[in-house]
C-alpha cells in the first residue's frame, strides 16, 4: 500500500493528522509520499485536491482505492487501512 499525503504548514488539521499518521506508521508498513500544498503546487494539482486539507490518497497496486479529506480519528484511518489491506 502507498499513501500520498498532502498538507500545509498553515493547516491546523494537518498538524493534528501528522501526529495520528506517525502513530499509524509505527504499526503499519506504508510507503508515504508527502506533498506540501503550497510548496509542491505542480505535483498537488495532479491529484485534483480542493481546499480542504489534509488529504490522504490510498493506493493499492498503483490504483487509487480510497481518499480521505480533512481530519479523521486514528481508528477511522486504521479501519480504512485494514479494509484495503497492506
Report each predicted region and the residues it spans.
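Thiol-based oxidoreductase modules, predominantly thioredoxin-like and allied folds used
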Residues: 5-7, 25, 29-42
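Preference for well-ordered, secondary-structure-rich cores of eukaryotic proteins
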Residues: 1-2, 40, 61
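Structural micro-motif
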Residues: 47-57
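Chalcogenol-based redox active-site neighborhoods
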Residues: 19, 46-47
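Local sequence-structure signature of Cys/Sec-based thiol-disulfide redox active-site neighborhoods
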Residues: 1-26
